[in-house]
Curated annotation (Swiss-Prot):
UniProt organism field: Arabidopsis thaliana
Domain GOLD: 34-149
Taxonomic placement: Eukaryota, Viridiplantae, Streptophyta, Embryophyta, Tracheophyta
Name of this protein: Transmembrane emp24 domain-containing protein p24delta9
Mode of membrane association: Single-pass type I membrane protein
Organism domain of life: Eukaryota
Function comment: Involved in vesicular protein trafficking. Mainly functions in the early secretory pathway. Thought to act as cargo receptor at the lumenal side for incorporation of secretory cargo molecules into transport vesicles and to be involved in vesicle coat formation at the cytoplasmic side.
């Protein structure tokens, strides 16, 4: 009973975090076009990706038109993976910087234009680890395996919460700075308006005095 409860808890937590750290996509790309996919990754997180151009005719080799170039970069412009004129490939690295990482695909230019179908699987954190490779020989080892996976999942959730808190603080600081600038701009606008109104008043007063209206 305990083992079933533990397994259920593990699965629920694992599914909860999987939606945030895993992308399995299928998309289309025309010849000569570029499409980018982003993933928000925190520093020191392991990330792996695998991409494949779908062969329209599996009985024959892929045509030359079904080639792509890919470049994976961080928000700071650092390149973590680059490949030219390939049908498939994979990448794996540990993120040094926190932020949005971009995987940009470019289909080779071809006339007439063709449409490529691409399968892309991008996993980060717990999902990047191949848990299926762990051998299980007895009930004790099964429980140990589940506990390890649960610990990894909880740690990943904990790190994700701290990361989101840091991003929230950054946004709050940005909002405070923006509000402060807007306040100073409002005061400056008010000062300019009062100055212009004062100059208009002096000008009109002088004008009417010369005309002996007042």
């Amino acid at each position: 009973m305990f083992l079933r409860s533990l397994n259920l808890c593990t699965i629920l937590l694992f599914l909860a975090i999987s939606s945030q750290v895993s992308q399995s996509l299928h998309f289309e790309l025309q010849s000569g076009r570029t499409k980018c996919i982003s993933e928000d990754i925190k520093s020191n997180s392991m990330t792996v990706g695998k991409y494949t151009v779908v062969n329209p005719n599996e009985a024959h080799p892929s045509p030359q038109s079904h080639k792509i170039s890919i470049r994976v970069t961080s928000s700071y412009g650092n390149t973590y993976h680059h490949a030219e004129d390939v049908e498939s490939g994979q990448f794996a690295f540990t993120a040094v910087e926190s932020g949005d990482y971009m995987a940009c695909y470019t289909a080779v230019d071809h006339k007439p234009e063709v449409t490529l179908s691409i399968d892309f699987d991008w996993r980060t954190g717990v999902q990047s680890k191949s848990w299926s490779s762990v051998a299980k020989k007895s009930q004790v080892e099964v429980m140990e395996f589940d506990v390890k996976r649960l610990i990894e999942t909880v740690n990943s959730i904990h790190e994700e919460m701290f990361y989101l808190r840091e991003r929230e603080e950054e946004m709050q600081n940005l909002n405070r700075a923006t509000n402060s600038k807007m306040a100073w701009l409002s005061f400056l606008s008010l000062f300019v308006c009062l100055g212009v109104a004062g100059m208009q008043f002096v000008h009109l007063k002088t004008f009417f005095e010369k005309k002996k209206v007042i």
